[in-house]
């Protein structure tokens, strides 16, 4: 929803934009420890439409380097296409929507407790739909804005091989559905030079069960299931700077708190040009 935050209460009929971002997420639960450092780039274009709508399209690429238990590592790449829109409901209220589709590839090397090495690669397609409602209050240059958001995400089932020097194992991952609800508040100051803001929120995962089966060449099978239900918080501090009446840059940093899964940090930097 970051793209839509930057659109709100800005002038201009049409605009092109781009951003780069990077960070690290971490998961430590169900006896599993993993983290990933990533960087990404995104670019898009949007314009105004009748009835107080603004909508656009964007392309996103992300490269990640993962670290797993016992020294394992992974190299992931994500490619995604997004359609987004925002409607001004007047009197400070708004609704945002984002639909995204793409796929992620991961090439990995794993180790067990005995330091046996296993290698493999996987590819999964995914989709997500997010909606948010909020309302801005305030007078003069200062404002505060409560908001609620719900996101559904889906990963399709995937099948791939994991091998070492002496054996091959087939992994069948079942489809995965995530249902995340967020509630938060943003406060800031709007000035002629740009904006300053701070955003705090709490999120809860209602779904997030991962299931997979493992089949060895000798006929042995095993199944695993992990419940990723969790609650965590996030804090963002950032601002924008107006380069001209039709162009601006922005930067912000986000930190996650609590929960087995969290975004330890993320740094965003980008620009927008209207014409």
Predicted regions and their residues:
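Outer membrane beta-barrel translocator domains of Type V secretion systems
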Residues: 1-147, 252-266, 270-273
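Outer membrane beta-barrel transmembrane domains
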Residues: 82, 87, 167-275
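Solvent-exposed, glycine/polar-rich loop segments of beta-barrel outer-membrane systems
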Residues: 30-37, 69-71, 105-123, 154-177, ...
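Generic multipass alpha-helical transmembrane bundles of integral membrane proteins
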Residues: 149-151
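Short, structured loop/turn "capping" segments at alpha-beta junctions
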Residues: 140-145, 155-159, 192-196
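Short hydrophobic/aromatic-rich motifs at helix boundaries and adjacent loops
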Residues: 13-17, 53-57, 156-158, 208-209, ...
